[in-house]
């Protein structure tokens, strides 16, 4: 009887090891003060977006209130959020970067 529990535990552990990591959307939120050019710079610098794609995302942020910059595993998403928010504050902009589960 003891083996059944052990087999189930091993099966659950293997299944959890095979699961892909949870993914998170990194989002830029609109505000009335951050210049559009700065948002484009953030998208290029931190998310490797070329100007046409960065402009499209910036316009989505402007018109819809937020835009997705990318989808990443939690650790990467969290780092990008921290980097963007720090960069915005260093440049005296209220731009807010957040993450949510994809």
Swiss-Prot record:
Query: Which BP terms does GO give this entry?
Result: protein catabolic process; proteolysis
Q: Identify the InterPro entries for this entry.
A: ClpS, ClpS_core, Ribosomal_bL12_C/ClpS-like
Top-level taxonomic group: Bacteria
| Pfam families named among the record's database cross-references | ClpS (PF02617)
Give the family from UniProt: Belongs to the ClpS family.
Function, please?
Involved in the modulation of the specificity of the ClpAP-mediated ATP-dependent protein degradation.
Give the multimer and partner information. Answer: Binds to the N-terminal domain of the chaperone ClpA.
Q: What is this protein called?
A: ATP-dependent Clp protease adapter protein ClpS
